[in-house]
């Protein structure tokens, strides 16, 4: 896997897109369907030719992530930006814990592979697949002491279909966090090379 700023920015955009969709669902009960499919599809990209291929091969697939990334890292201090950043940092922390749990990694990998048939049969945004992926997250990542507190409208979050989407997207966020680390990303980068990431994300949006 390439360790360039380009690849790190793409992976961060994927992570940011998942976090953004979690926020949208938690507050509004809906999100962009194409962006959702991109995130879920990334879980099944096990042998990508490039980082962009993980997300479908086109920059348009992660345009929402690139757009929000260039905004939230600019530290304008908007409450919605802070919330997305919190989700992103929490997912990066959870991925670091997961890396030290090879047995759990194997379980997740095997169960995602089992879900591949559901994905190919029903599509990446079907409730059957989202429920399947949500159960993987609940049975594995959710058992860590560090847990992501999703804030939003309680009535919306109590609906099973919304809870499933949120958990499936958090699992996709972990996938992007893995990709980011594999391409050379680390937490300090978000502080010290933030401006470079913002600049490159904006270049990719042109």
From Swiss-Prot:
<keyword id="KW-1003">Cell membrane</keyword>
<dbReference type="InterPro" id="IPR035932">
    <property type="entry name" value="HflD-like_sf"/>
</dbReference>
<keyword id="KW-0472">Membrane</keyword>
<keyword id="KW-0997">Cell inner membrane</keyword>
<dbReference type="GO" id="GO:0005886">
    <property type="term" value="C:plasma membrane"/>
</dbReference>
<dbReference type="Pfam" id="PF04356">
    <property type="entry name" value="DUF489"/>
</dbReference>
<comment type="similarity">
    <text>Belongs to the HflD family.</text>
</comment>
<dbReference type="InterPro" id="IPR007451">
    <property type="entry name" value="HflD"/>
</dbReference>
<keyword id="KW-0963">Cytoplasm</keyword>
<protein>
    <recommendedName>
        <fullName>High frequency lysogenization protein HflD homolog</fullName>
    </recommendedName>
</protein>
<dbReference type="GO" id="GO:0005737">
    <property type="term" value="C:cytoplasm"/>
</dbReference>
């Amino acid at each position: 896997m390439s360790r360039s700023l380009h690849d790190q920015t793409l992976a961060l955009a994927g992570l940011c897109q998942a976090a953004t969709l979690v926020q949208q669902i938690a507050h509004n009960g809906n999100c962009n369907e194409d962006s959702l499919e991109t995130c879920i599809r990334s879980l099944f990209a096990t042998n990508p030719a490039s980082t962009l291929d993980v997300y479908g091969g086109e920059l348009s697939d992660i345009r929402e992530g690139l757009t929000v990334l260039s905004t939230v890292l600019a530290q304008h201090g908007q409450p919605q930006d802070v919330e997305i950043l919190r989700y992103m940092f929490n997912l990066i922390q959870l991925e670091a814990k997961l890396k030290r749990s090879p047995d759990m990694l194997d379980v997740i990998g095997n169960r995602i592979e089992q879900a591949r048939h559901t994905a190919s049969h029903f599509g990446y945004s079907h409730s059957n697949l989202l429920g399947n992926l949500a159960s993987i997250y609940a049975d594995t990542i959710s058992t860590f002491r560090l847990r992501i507190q999703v804030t939003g409208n309680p009535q919306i979050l109590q609906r099973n279909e919304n809870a499933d989407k949120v958990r499936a997207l958090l699992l996709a966020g972990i996938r992007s966090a893995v990709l980011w680390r594999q391409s050379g990303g680390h937490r300090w980068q978000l502080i010290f090379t933030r401006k470079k990431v913002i600049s490159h994300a904006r270049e990719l949006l042109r």
